[in-house]
């Protein structure tokens, strides 16, 4: 890993419209602009889930990097994986309901791929983070009410771990922020691999020990 000496990051450009990823970056202390990528791959079972998440993040980052000459692009992709395969964002309320009923009362994995591109020198770094979850049992009526709220429609697997009115997750092993969509420890590690030393807000210590993560202890704001 290169020496971590540079605290002066280039302009950060987040290639995502996700309000949850934006909130995580803000709470970590980053200033950034948002330029969502419209490029996206669709899972077809031809590659492993972790590889797919990484490829999708890289696709989004390169899409924005084509028109950017001065900046650090951050792109991410999060997938939910059960025994039948990858669950992305639901395409319809019906699919969201099917996803929820498929996951309820069972265990699954959440994988986030992150890609950083420094457009000033062409540096590219990618990485993944993985968490294991067990969903609580819930009735079809509960799942239907959650779908009707609209909250699941922009989330991989059709649920948000931070949605407190529904609270779908019974147990989590691994990074909470990975499930939300942007694992802080993976992001900081990739920045350090590029030679940057990001200055974080107080109480952020994402060094791989999730118990040190402030949001792990307090939960992300429900409005995100």
From Swiss-Prot:
The active site is at residue 77. Pfam families: Maf (PF02545). Gene3D superfamilies: 3.90.950.10. The keyword Transferase does not apply. One of its GO terms (cellular component) is cytoplasm. The keyword Membrane does not apply. The record marks 20, 78, 162 as: Important for substrate specificity. It catalyses: dTTP + H2O = dTMP + diphosphate + H(+); UTP + H2O = UMP + diphosphate + H(+). Its EC number is 3.6.1.9. GO terms for biological process: nucleotide metabolic process. This is dTTP/UTP pyrophosphatase.
């Amino acid at each position: 890993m290169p020496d971590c000496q540079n605290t002066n990051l280039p302009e950060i450009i987040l290639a995502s419209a996700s309000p949850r990823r934006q909130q995580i970056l803000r709470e970590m202390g980053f200033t950034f602009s948002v330029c969502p990528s419209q490029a996206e791959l669709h899972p077809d079972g031809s590659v492993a889930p972790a590889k797919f998440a990484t490829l999708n993040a890289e696709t989004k980052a390169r899409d924005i990097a084509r028109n950017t000459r001065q900046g650090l692009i951050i792109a991410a992709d999060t997938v939910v994986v059960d025994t039948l395969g990858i669950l992305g964002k639901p395409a319809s309320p019906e699919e969201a309901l099917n996803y929820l009923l498929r996951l309820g009362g069972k265990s699954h994995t959440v994988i986030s791929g992150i890609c950083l591109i420094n457009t000033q020198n062409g540096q590219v770094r990618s990485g993944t983070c993985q968490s294991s979850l067990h969903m609580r049992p819930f009735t079809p009526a509960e799942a239907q009410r959650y779908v009707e709220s609209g909250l699941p429609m922009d989330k991989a697997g059709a649920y948000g771990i931070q949605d407190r009115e529904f609270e779908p997750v019974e147990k989590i092993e691994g990074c909470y922020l990975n499930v939300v969509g942007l694992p802080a420890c993976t992001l900081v590690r990739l920045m350090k691999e590029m030679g940057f030393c990001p200055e974080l807000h107080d109480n952020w210590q994402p060094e791989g020990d999730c118990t040190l993560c402030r949001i792990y202890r307090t939960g992300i704001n429900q409005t995100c």
